[in-house]
UniProtKB/Swiss-Prot annotation:
Matching NCBIfam families: PRK01231.1, PRK03378.1
Presence of the UniProt keyword Protein transport in the record: no
Similarity remark: Belongs to the NAD kinase family.
An example Gene Ontology biological process: NADP biosynthetic process
Listed name of the protein: NAD kinase
E.C. designation(s): 2.7.1.23
Length: 293
């Protein structure tokens, strides 16, 4: 039995990964044998070959655990982190997906790295999130929270969106485009990168605005301070608008309502192994060339 700075650990994942079964079982038994209380997300509880596990949903894990281990890819991490960011809990991922920008641990060496992490040897990194709100008259409603990005688009391919963008109530530009991506540094390596946006190091306190297929070549990606409030206004004759936060369920917007995006009060409390390096991670994930000099 080994001492751990974490008293209760949540194991989170999704059963769509066939190779997750062994990872779940091995990880659970390893933690259990160390005398650590383990809570399993209910979606994955059937993957275990034991009935001794404590079962709970993401909110239960957020309430009772002080570390969550997410098994899967970045999509699974985003799903879990969207809920867990509301709680005081640290998160790390075992990568069973493709790129895995947010899931650091290789399943083959995960237990070695986790052993060091349980002893307190890790890098702690806090990532900020974005809230999206709408205002209708004097009523303000939070529609969702994004770890990666907020995406504004229309459901019809033939129609472009026209909007005016304001930063801190100052008119900045108007645009006709297929949509707009508003990304955090965490999301700058996702859809925003594919749309021509820059990569932001997680330590950069910035928000990336990336027009999607703009009608004018002068409409370029820009980076603004993450303390800024972004607001979007639309003309009355506007096709049906849709918003997605981290590719979650679509949110349909009334064009007569003003949209606001700003930094959330919640954070994503990530931890990494001590040997983690963001730029080495980028080089591996994006296939950048090795040193040639």
């Amino acid at each position: 039995m080994t001492s751990s700075i974490f008293r209760t650990i949540g194991i989170i994942g999704h059963s769509s990964y066939p190779k997750a079964i062994n990872t779940y079982d091995v990880l659970y038994r390893w933690l259990y044998n160390k005398g650590i209380k383990v809570m399993i997300e209910q979606h994955a509880s059937h993957l275990l070959r034991t009935h001794k596990a404590i079962i709970g949903n993401l909110h239960d894990i957020g309430d009772y655990a002080d570390l969550a281990i997410v098994i899967g890819g970045d999509g699974n991490m985003l799903r879990a982190a969207n809920v867990l960011s509301q709680y005081d809990i640290k998160i790390i991922g075992i990568n069973l997906g493709n790129l895995g920008f947010l899931t650091d641990l290789n399943p083959h060496s995960a237990l070695i790295e986790l052993s060091k992490i349980l002893s307190g040897h890790f890098i702690n990194e806090k990532r900020f999130l974005l809230d999206i709100k709408i205002q209708h008259y004097n009523n303000v409603t939070i529609l969702g929270t994004a770890i990666n990005e907020v995406i504004l688009y229309t459901n019809t391919i033939k129609n472009m969106i026209k909007f005016e963008l304001y930063i801190n109530n100052n008119f900045t530009f108007s645009s006709r485009s297929d949509g707009l991506i508003i990304a955090t540094p965490t999301g700058s390596t996702a859809y925003a990168l594919s749309a021509g946006g820059p990569i932001l190091s997680p330590s950069v306190e910035g928000i990336v605005l990336v027009p999607i297929c703009p009608h004018t070549v002068s409409s370029r990606p820009i980076i603004i301070d993450n303390k800024s409030t972004i607001s979007l206004k639309f003309p009355k004759i506007t096709p049906k608008l849709t918003i997605r936060c981290d590719n979650q369920n679509p949110i349909y917007i009334d064009k007569e309502k003003e949209i606001f995006i700003q930094r959330s009060n919640h954070i994503l409390d990530l931890i990494h192994p001590n040997n983690y390096n963001y730029f080495k991670n980028l080089r591996i994930k994006l296939g950048w060339q090795k040193n040639s000099i």
